[in-house]
């Protein structure tokens, strides 16, 4: 084992490395692992041999898909790193890792600056209020420009960067950094062997003025954050390195600003100072403080847990992974208390007991067994049967439910048909395991065709899931064409609609009458349905009310136009009637279901389609073709801007029009343009498109 798990939480950092696809995140993580002594053979993403990219496809595709948790040590501090993917189809991985991090390193490409995916990941980090430091990577690349990248952090992210280093040289002549906190040059001149220690030098004469200018900006920012420091600064006294670092740390932990460093991970330059900055400026579990949750069965009663060994045990499961030998691994962040292997805990989310088999701290896909799990750390557990992503584990005598995670619904679906009978059986196992691991992966049975339909966040996401079925579970299957996950909704209010369910066939019959109102609705937290009971005076017995709600929700699975799920509506149960003998839960469920269907037909039903936020980067000369093409795909151009010599077009385009776009774009621009897209929102489809969708769905 590397070193004992540190119990002094001041010396622990739980961080993520977040970036755009090719900003060099995996290489940066690799270097961190090398310099912290975990990894003795360096893996390059270019060769497909990186430590954190441990699934076969990640090695092939050179992109990080699964956030592996890695533990390492630096100057007597423990760093637990969650590697996050930089591809938009894997937003679920980013979301779930950000939920359990205390801080993050945002890696930017020194030539490209802030790219579309960086913006999205940055927004997700802001959602969970994760403090960040910025590492401007690839300073050795042709066209790398540190000052341009810092400006893009201001312009594109609306963030406040605090420059702590200036680059010495650029491109092939990038030799190191000027440290503005200690006012010294830290250099790695020429070609540097991995692990080489930097040389400390005087600041080069040609950078002296620039260093003085940026040092002054740094000191002003530091002085403004603290009255004592301001008095000292205006009295002309020197601020000590400790005072400067303390002030930067405080502002970083409060997300008031974001320290910026630079380097070239690939060329082994700038990694050690970045690790120092992780320790100096990013928060430890004690800085984050207590975590909030609610009592079991009562969301109004707020409970808290402090990051201490002496508190009752509480943890959040943030990832499930399949392991070739151990089966199901559950990654957890422990927020309070301690637990031993073999102990029984409560899954408060599901109300079930679980027994922990073994405990590990992970290093990519190697396991280090530990004999206790303590507050503030990240572990992998074996033996949990019912726990899934977002579940709370806690002490049985002190239950608490921690805030879970919200995951978007899939926007794209494909049908999948096993080739043989044995493939059919294996497919069942594969789907169950993959669905456990990935909350944005959905599975349903198309009742008309009998086909299994799987859904995900994009074409690449589904490609990789199908690929994993083949490799890991040996399932051979035919995969259909991608289909868009449409939705249906209503546009008008129906004040009153009544429905009576009556059946008389010898003996006791069935009777239920409901009167409902239906109206468009969107909840604050993104909820797409609300049920309100307005029945008074026992017109419908209390025990039958939930059946009406359940029936309505069943009916919402299949909309009234083309059979797509109904969303964004509120159902109010106004009145009704029952029969002492013939009424039952089942009768009211049927009545609720039929009433909703009939009312929805009167409520101006429409079809919704997913719109994607598309960003195309293209050379100037192809701009007209690109815009014309997006318009022909029903795209709405949102903005155009210039970025590092190229033009950028931002548009909202229906997902149904984006299949095969990459090939068309390449042929129109001779392979010189690229694009990214992320799900944006659902919007009503135009009438002519709606007709086509309905005709296709109903076979007319």
Curated annotation (Swiss-Prot):
Q: Where does GTP bind?
A: 19-26, 83-87, 137-140
Q: Which residues form a coiled coil?
A: none
Where the record annotates domain tr-type G, the positions are 10-286
InterPro entries listed in its UniProt record: EFG_II, EFG_III, EFG_III/V, EFG_IV, EFG_V, EFG_V-like, EFTu-like_2, G_TR_CS
Q: A GO biological process this protein is involved in?
A: ribosome disassembly
**Superkingdom of origin organism:** Bacteria
Q: Where are the transmembrane segments?
A: none
Gene Ontology molecular-function annotations: GTP binding; GTPase activity; translation elongation factor activity
Q: Which UniProt keywords apply?
A: Cytoplasm, Elongation factor, GTP-binding, Nucleotide-binding, Protein biosynthesis
Annotated function: Catalyzes the GTP-dependent ribosomal translocation step during translation elongation. During this step, the ribosome changes from the pre-translocational (PRE) to the post-translocational (POST) state as the newly formed A-site-bound peptidyl-tRNA and P-site-bound deacylated tRNA move to the P and E sites, respectively. Catalyzes the coordinated movement of the two tRNA molecules, the mRNA and conformational changes in the ribosome.
The record's annotation in HAMAP family points to:
EF_G_EF_2_B
Designated name of the protein: Elongation factor G
The gene for this chain is fusA
